């Protein structure tokens, strides 16, 4: 049995295909199989598409710039894309009037791959995407994935067999903040002992069921909510600001508050303050200091 604390990491930007591979390999914890090349990532992404695993394409942002009205009209109606319109581009030292933020999945599912000819590096007029890696308990992950305008890839207890060598033949659990920060040493010792005993029992039963021939998707039913999971979440800054508004709030669970405030500091290099106001106005200025996009949002993900 392994006990760790939760953590969050703002992932570095990379190519579309490497973003897809990075997220997808989280599900099976197969990162070691990646050859870490652009060609390998492209082939991996093509296999995802061939097998219909489009959800992983959510993690590949695409930034476009164009003056074509027909392209604007398509993305303006697409609930998973954002469009920013500049009526007088010259006033902004720009050659384009439409700045579009979307993802690779939208292009693939709508047979619009040809629009990649309009792809540009992200500008201040785009609704910038960020990918984040959470290492947390299943309980906290359940709260994170309720933010449905983000795309997710999560470590799978169906396919990850924790009795295997690559997991050191053990189950990893997250130590809850309540156990870490109890008021007195005596209470902390008692609570910690009871917690670790419960986790040890769960691991024992899980490994025993695997040894008896059960598959991971069956044996996982005895694992508690404190079981460690890894989760990659990707989405535009507008979605992340909504995440911060809800998860940094005093009413949020203490453990997710800690993660959210840590992530906010990583994104903006300053501490979260309850005085920060986030809005969904189409003309708001984003936290990054750039002009945000006019966004068409939906309450459902693409898959």
Where does each model-flagged region fall?
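Family-specific signature for flavin-dependent thymidylate synthase
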Residues: 1-303
């Amino acid at each position: 049995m392994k006990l760790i604390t939760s953590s969050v990491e703002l992932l570095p930007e990379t190519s579309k295909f490497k973003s897809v591979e990075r997220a997808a390999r989280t599900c099976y914890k197969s990162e070691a199989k990646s050859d870490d090349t652009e060609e390998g990532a492209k082939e991996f992404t093509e296999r995802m598409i061939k097998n219909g695993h489009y959800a992983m394409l959510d993690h590949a942002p695409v930034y476009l710039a164009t003056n074509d009205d027909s392209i604007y009209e398509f993305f303006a109606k697409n609930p998973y894309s954002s469009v920013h319109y500049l009526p007088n581009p010259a006033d902004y030292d720009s050659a384009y009037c439409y700045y579009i933020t979307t993802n690779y999945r939208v292009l693939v599912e709508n047979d619009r791959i040809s629009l990649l000819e309009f792809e540009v590096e992200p500008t201040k007029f785009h609704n910038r995407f960020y990918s984040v890696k959470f290492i947390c308990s299943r309980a906290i992950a359940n709260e994170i994935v309720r933010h449905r305008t983000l795309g997710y890839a999560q470590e799978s207890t169906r396919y990850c067999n924790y009795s295997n060598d690559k997991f050191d033949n053990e189950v990893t659990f997250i130590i809850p903040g309540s156990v870490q920060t109890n008021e007195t040493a005596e209470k902390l010792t008692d609570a910690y002992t009871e917690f670790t005993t419960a986790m040890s029992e769960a691991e024992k039963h899980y490994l025993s069921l695997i040894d008896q021939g059960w598959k991971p998707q069956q044996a996982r039913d005895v694992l508690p909510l404190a079981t460690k999971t890894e989760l990659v979440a990707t989405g535009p800054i507008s979605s992340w600001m909504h995440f911060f508004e809800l998860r940094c709030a005093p009413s949020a669970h203490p453990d997710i508050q800690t993660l959210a405030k840590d992530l906010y500091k990583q994104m903006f290099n300053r501490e979260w303050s309850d005085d920060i106001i986030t809005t969904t106005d189409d003309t708001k200025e984003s936290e990054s200091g750039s002009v945000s996009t006019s966004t068409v949002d939906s309450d459902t993900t693409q898959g």
